[in-house]
Amino acid sequence: MRKISSFISLLLICLAFTSCVDYVQSVTFKNGKYHMYYKVTLSKLLFAMMDEDPEEIFRGFDEEALGEVPENASVSPVNTDLEVGAEFKFGIDPKTTDETEKAFLPTIAGSKCYIPFILGENESIADSVGTDTDNDYGEAFAEAIMSSAKCRILISKGVIPSIETAYFEGKGNQNYSIPVFDYGDDNCLEIPFIVLSQKGMYRTDRVVVIRK
């Protein structure tokens, strides 16, 4: 799972300069299996402004480059008029004994459910905010951009019917509260990208969801 998060974090470094990034992660449960979906895309407008070829990032990208992902994972390019990126899909039996697959599964303990958040695993993300700024104004500007960009986690109500609260665990019980929105068949968790730069304060490799 470390390899896939490294790939995604490479793309999201662009957030140091623009908020033209979209990250979506979802989990559903159908026919006795968890179905996982991940998508990360960049705006083609960004590359047009930089006079760069957006498809160059994804050229030669395939499942082998991902490393630790389930063998049944499918990887598809995303290439529309507005964005370019990749999406990943795979199903996992909740009774699997495969360690790679188990790393992606939600874990339920009483009223708590732990949702793996692969984007929060990579250490380089913490270095992508404010590290290249030479003054307080530059750092504040970078943080403002990061705060406007959000990662979304969609959790099917077939997995968790109702959510009371969601958060990242913090030191000294100072947790980071994550907003939850009702999307009909799903609950949506919106995570500002800026919080991923605060790894010393929060455990960001998983989201704690409290069920009602």
Q: Residue spans of the language-model regions?
A:
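Post-signal peptide N-terminal segment of mature Sec-exported envelope proteins
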Residues: F29-L45
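Mature, soluble, non-transmembrane domains
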Residues: N72-K212
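Bacterial signal peptide processing site
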Residues: V21-Y23
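Buried hydrophobic packing residues in well-ordered domains
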Residues: Q25-V27, G32, I153
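C-terminal motif of bacterial Sec signal peptides marking the signal peptidase cleavage site
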Residues: A16-S19
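Post-signal-peptide N-terminal segment of Sec-exported extracytoplasmic proteins
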Residues: L42-E68
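Positively charged n-region of N-terminal signal peptides that target proteins for export
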Residues: M1-S5
